Amino acid sequence: MSLESSSTSVPPCFPSVLPSVPDDIASSSPPPMSYITSQEMKCILYWFASWSGPQRERFLQDLVAKAVPGKLQPLLDALEQLSMSAANRPPCIFECQLRLWDQWFRGWAEQERNEFVRQLEVSEPDFVAKFYQAVAATAGKD
């Protein structure tokens, strides 16, 4: 059962009964984030707090690859992390968390992705500084 109604739009044949909002006000603030998206972000931030240094580094590489999707170097770095010996064992909790992270992130709008980085920066400013440095380091690389 969905918590949000999918039938909130007014059919085009009915005139709008809502007052119009000036464009400068409507565009100044992003639409509110969905409850589900905010809960997904909370989960990731909670998991992040318990990750080890190497796990955070792996997450950093993934975050950079998502922030700079057209660049080849982050993809090569991520491939380097894969291990053929891992194919015979079930995934660990961290790997499951990364899979959920990937699935959720792909469903977020750009403003929600930016909000996630902002929230992460509040709790982990040093990590986000490393993220920004890593993104900047991809400039000019293919």
Swiss-Prot record:
Pfam families cross-referenced by the UniProt entry: DUF4508
Location relative to the cell: Mitochondrion
Q: What keywords does the record list, in alphabetical order?
A: Mitochondrion
Q: Which InterPro entries does the record cross-reference, listed alphabetically? A: DUF4508 (IPR028019)
GO CC term (a single one): cytosol
Tree of life domain: Eukaryota
Name where it mostly resides. mitochondrion
Alphabetical list of PANTHER family matching this protein: CHROMOSOME 14 OPEN READING FRAME 119-LIKE-RELATED (PTHR16260:SF3), SIMILAR TO 1700123O20RIK PROTEIN (PTHR16260)
User: What name goes with this protein?
Assistant: Uncharacterized protein C14orf119 homolog
